[in-house]
């Protein structure tokens, strides 16, 4: 839910701001929302009060993206897909799902709309990425591609322990595989891996170190930091086999296709470019200065003015 909420946070404020904005078009801005002795709070009063808040800014952005992508790609995401994603998340949270929704400021329907908008944007980005499957991009991906490498890995949690184990595995006659099985602190005790440069089974630093080694070569201690827990782990790698890279990029076309699509769809700049084009196609214009900057992250050199005013 956390990932999807980045795209559509603050649905409750969205409901208030968007609804009141709509109401102001149907009724007078002076319509009373609250009355009290000696004073009143009008639609305009409330709108002016909340529209500059961070939640309202995010909510208006969400509403714009929802409308634009639903208009342009609405038939590409079915209610069934949305429900499946919703139910999967609900199952993961179990009995705490309702509480999680409430804490996120979401209703069930609001969260489903959030999921739908995210899926629509993802679809648009994937379709745009497919257009990047050019021969030039295939050749560029091939230059940076390393075919399958087989390794044995020892994972350790302490640097001093890693240095001690490194001495053991580099000693004459050392049985790396045996030491790896005895010393690794990996929860699954796995020590044998195969991967190419597009793999994700091990940290990038570990794979990069492996690619630099010759067959039967043993690395020094390689440290990595988990981006989620910020915990440092230490690795010692031995390469047991290396696949020679073929000279024709077409030999790896299917794998390179995966690489290109993954790189593009995960690239924030590319995502923003796709969203920018959709906004320009919809001729989105911001009429209230309070929201003038909410689309600035999607503004491009051409057409940026239409996204700002």
UniProtKB/Swiss-Prot annotation:
Family assignment from sequence similarity: Belongs to the PrsA family.
GO biological process terms, semicolon-separated: protein folding
Name of the protein this chain belongs to: Foldase protein PrsA
Lipid attachment, kind N-palmitoyl cysteine: 23
Membrane topology classification: Lipid-anchor
EC number assigned by the record: 5.2.1.8
UniProt superkingdom: Bacteria
Catalytic reactions of this protein: [protein]-peptidylproline (omega=180) = [protein]-peptidylproline (omega=0)
């Amino acid at each position: 839910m956390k990932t999807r909420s980045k795209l559509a946070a603050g649905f409750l404020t969205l409901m208030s701001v968007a609804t009141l904005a709509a109401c102001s078009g149907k009724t007078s801005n002076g319509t009373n929302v609250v009355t009290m002795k000696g004073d009143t709070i009008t639609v305009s009063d409330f709108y002016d009060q909340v529209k500059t808040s961070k939640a309202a800014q995010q909510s208006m952005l969400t509403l714009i993206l929802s409308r634009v992508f639903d208009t342009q790609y609405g038939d590409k995401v079915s209610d069934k897909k949305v429900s499946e994603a919703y139910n999967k998340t609900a199952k993961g949270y179990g009995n705490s799902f309702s509480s999680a929704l409430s804490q996120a400021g979401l209703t069930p329907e609001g969260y489903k709309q959030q999921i739908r908008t995210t899926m629509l944007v993802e679809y648009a980005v994937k379709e745009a990425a497919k257009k990047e499957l050019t021969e030039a991009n295939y050749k560029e991906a091939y230059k940076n591609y390393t075919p399958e490498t087989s390794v044995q890995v020892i994972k350790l949690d302490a640097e001093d322990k890693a240095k001690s184990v490194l001495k053991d595995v580099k000693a004459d006659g050392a049985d790396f595989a045996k030491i790896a099985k005895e010393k690794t602190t990996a929860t699954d005790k796995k020590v044998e891996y195969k991967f190419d440069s597009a793999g994700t089974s091990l940290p990038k630093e570990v794979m990069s170190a492996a690619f630099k080694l010759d067959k039967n070569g043993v690395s020094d201690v390689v440290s990595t930091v988990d981006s989620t827990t910020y915990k440092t782990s230490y690795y010692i790698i031995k390469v047991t086999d290396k696949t020679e890279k073929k000279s024709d990029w077409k030999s790896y076309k299917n794998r390179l296709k995966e690489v290109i699509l993954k790189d593009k769809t995960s690239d924030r700049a590319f995502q923003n470019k796709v969203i920018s084009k959709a906004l320009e196609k919809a001729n989105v214009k911001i009429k209230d200065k309070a929201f003038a900057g909410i689309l600035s992250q999607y503004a491009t050199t051409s057409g940026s003015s239409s996204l700002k005013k």
